[in-house]
Structure formats: structure tokens, C-alpha cells
């Protein structure tokens, strides 16, 4: 899913009320799941055993629940509930309507 424009890591961290580890000026253009991420995308991972796979993915930003040092060129957003933060970010850009 692509954002309506490019946003900085600092701005996204503010929206998520996350601790940011990495470059606050890093730019993001969208979000997606681990198998579909591209450079400039954000994903989440909430199980530490998958952190390595997330860091090896094309994602530029990863929402996690532990403060870890990201590889060069990536940012980490630390929150208590990564899935909820990912949902919050998605809801900011994509309005979901219930089917009746």
C-alpha cells in the first residue's frame, strides 16, 4: 500500500508514539507485509525470531516491540504492540468500510 506522499521516519514515529532508532529524516512511501515490501516501505514484526528476516527484507522501516539496532539504511519503530501500530498507520491512509 502506498502513502499519499512521502513521510519522514520522525513524522511516522510521532504518529505511532514510537521510539525511533535510525535516521529521523529517512523517507517512507508505503507499507506492506514482509513478502511484498519494497525499499521505502514499512512492515511490522512482533516475534524476535523473525527480526533477522525483517532486517534482510527490502523494508526500510520495521515496527518492533524491542529496542534493537537496525542495519545501515533502515529504521526501527519501537512500540509495545507492533501489529496495533501497523493497523494504526494503515488506518491513517486507508479507510475501511464494513460490508452490509
PLM feature spans:
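Terminal amphipathic alpha-helical/low-complexity segments used for targeting or macromolecular assembly
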Residues: 1-100
Amino acid at each position: 500500500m502506498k502513502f499519499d506522499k512521502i513521510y519522514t521516519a520522525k513524522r511516522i514515529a510521532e504518529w505511532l508514539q514510537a521510539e525511533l532508532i535510525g535516521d529521523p529524516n529517512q523517507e517512507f512511501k508505503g507499507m506492506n507485509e514482509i513478502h511484498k515490501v519494497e525499499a521505502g516501505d514499512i512492515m511490522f514484526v512482533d516475534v524476535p525470531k523473525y527480526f533477522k528476516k525483517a532486517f534482510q527484507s527490502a523494508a526500510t522501516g520495521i515496527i518492533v516491540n524491542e529496542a534493537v539496532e537496525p542495519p545501515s539504511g533502515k529504521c526501527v519503530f519501537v512500540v509495545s504492540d507492533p501489529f496495533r501500530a501497523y493497523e494504526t498507520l494503515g488506518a491513517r491512509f486507508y479507510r475501511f468500510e464494513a460490508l452490509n
